[in-house]
Regions:
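Conserved structural motif at the start of ABC-family nucleotide-binding domains
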Residues: 2, 17-18, 73
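Conserved ABC transporter NBD signature motif
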Residues: 56-67, 71-72
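Conserved ABC ATPase signature
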Residues: 88, 129-136
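Conserved ABC ATPase "signature" region
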Residues: 96, 100, 107-125
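Catalytic Walker B motif of ABC-type/P-loop ATPase nucleotide-binding domains
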Residues: 154-158
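ABC transporter nucleotide-binding domain
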Residues: 170-247
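C-terminal coupling/interaction segments
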Residues: 240-279
Length: 279
């Protein structure tokens, strides 16, 4: 359980990254979504005790982030977006070193590392230099660290940013095997829908939406996405589920041959809020 109370972060240049976040994140998989600069990473860094808040506080399983830093780090694994394995080390060495650093004996770390890498499909590569691995495999090594350490809480910051679709699915499969509470930040709506039980939408350091995927979609029941099909195969996706206007000069050049009506998705919920915030 993560609880935050009026959490604020203002950087020295005056940028307000978090503007009074008060939320409770219960024991399950939670996705924090939002555009770049919404405050997702700042939130993750503060709650994982890597960054001090300007004001406010947070608790992780009852532990105070300002007073119980060491205890929180012992029960949490945080994987930042920029994390990358040390190229000369093998995945086996990476995971074993990580576990020993958290207090596990060398013999136990060796056994657990090998078994966990096998479990996540890295048996063939566990003794190869990490700089020979694909982007997806490198990210899986870090998920493997979290799985092997068996912490109470795992924080994943943008776990699949920059990965190709195949690598992204590989990482998703690995994440689904994590035990304990998992909190991930992402701007991929498909990722949030596939991995999380609950979604929290951040925008400009504030919480705009908070609930299960099913609950969020039900709030927009009756709204649909409409795509207009033109004669030259040019499709127009209608934002905010409605057509605001059609320029008559454009209409002269195109013939509407048909349309497709689709059910609203989490991606659409995100886009709707984006329009509302910017207007």
């Amino acid at each position: 359980m993560i609880e935050t109370s009026d959490l604020k972060k203002v950087y020295k240049n005056g940028t307000v990254a978090l503007d009074g976040i008060s939320i409770n994140i219960p024991d399950r998989v939670t996705a924090i979504i939002g555009r770049n600069g919404a405050g997702k990473t700042t939130f993750a860094r503060i709650v994982s005790t890597q960054l001090m808040p300007t004001s406010g506080n947070a608790r992780v399983n009852g532990l105070d982030i300002l007073k119980d830093t060491k205890k929180i780090r012992n029960i949490m694994v945080s994987i930042p977006q920029e994390a990358s394995p040390i190229g000369v080390l093998t995945p086996m060495e990476q995971v074993k070193l990580f576990l020993v650093g958290r207090g596990m004996s060398v013999n136990e770390a060796n056994t657990v590392s090998s078994a966990t890498l096998d479990e996540l499909g890295l048996r063939e590569f566990k003794n190869s230099p990490s700089d020979m691995l694909s982007g997806g495999m490198k990210r899986k090594v870090f998920v493997c660290m979290a799985l092997a350490a068996n912490p109470d809480v795992v924080f994943l910051d943008e776990p699949t940013t920059g990965l190709d679709p195949i690598s992204r699915f590989e990482v998703w499969s690995a994440v689904k095997q994590l035990k304990g509470d998992v909190i991930l930040t992402t701007h991929y709506m498909e990722e949030a829908e596939n991995l999380s039980d609950r979604v929290i939408l951040f925008e400009k350091g504030r919480v705009l939406e908070d609930g299960t995927v099913k609950t969020l979609l039900s709030r927009f029941k009756g709204k649909v996405r409409v795509e207009l099909h033109h004669g030259d195969n040019y499709d127009v996706k209608v934002g905010s589920m409605k057509i605001k206007y059609v320029d008559s000069r454009d209409a002269e050049d195109y013939v509407i041959e048909g349309n497709t009506v689709k059910a609203i998705t989490l991606d659409d919920v995100f886009l709707i809020h984006g329009v509302e915030v910017e207007s």
